[in-house]
C-alpha cells in the first residue's frame, strides 16, 4: 500500500500545510466577505469599510479562493452532528484539525549542530507540549534519549527516537515506529493517514490516540524502516509523551541524531531508500 498514492487520490483538498499569518488573515477576511456579500454588500464597499485597497482585496480573494472555499466547507461541517458526516467529511475535519495545530515556525537554533547532547535534547523538546511518563500507552507518541545495546555493530542508530508506541513484545521490549527513519514531510503524511483511519477522536484533542498494531501499518511505505524494538533499561532519562496537539509540530523538528560507529551519520543517507 503506497501511502503517498492514497493521500493524493482520496484526501479532500485542504489549506496548505504551512500557512503564513497573512494567508490566515486573508482567509478569515474572505469568510467575512462571503457573509457580507450574502446581505447585499459589494466587494468594493466591503474593502472600503475595512480600509483595504480594493485592488489588494480583489487580488487576495483570487489568490486565496481555494483556501476560503475549504474554510467555508469546514465551518459547515463543524456545525453538523458527527453521526451525519460521511467518511470523507470526517477525514477532512480530522486533517484540518491536525494541520491547524502547526505553528508558523518552530524555532530550533540547535538543529544544525553536529553532536546533539542529552542537554540539547531536553531543551529542544521543551518547545512542544509534553509530559514525562513511566508507562507509555499504545497509540501515543513519545520522545526519549537512547543508548543502543549493539551500537558497535549496528550500521546506524538514532540517539533521540520519536516513536508511535505499539506496545510491549517478547523479552519486555518496547516496539514502536520511529518517525525519524523517514523524512519530515513523509512523517507528516504518514501520521495524517493514520489519523484518518485509526484515530479514536474525530478531531485532535488531548485524548487522541491511534488504535493500531503492527499488522495494520506494516504495509505502509517506510514502515519496515521505522519499526524498532527498544530495551527499557537503555532509555536515558524519562520518556516524554507528546501532547496530540503538538504532534504536527514535533514530526517536523530535526530531533534525530543518527550515529554509526561512534560518529554522526547523515540523516539523508538514512532516508535515501524511502
Swiss-Prot record:
Keyword presence, Transmembrane: no
Keyword tags: DNA end degradation evasion by virus, Host-virus interaction, Inhibition of host innate immune response by virus, Viral immunoevasion, Virion
Keyword Disulfide bond attached: no
A Gene Ontology term for the protein's cellular component: virion component
Any one GO biological process: symbiont-mediated suppression of host innate immune response
Compartment(s): Virion
Disulfides per UniProt: none
Described function: Binds to the viral DNA ends and protects the viral DNA against recBCD mediated degradation.
Protein name as it appears in the record: Terminal DNA protecting protein
Taxonomic source organism: Enterobacteria phage T4
Gene coding for it: 2
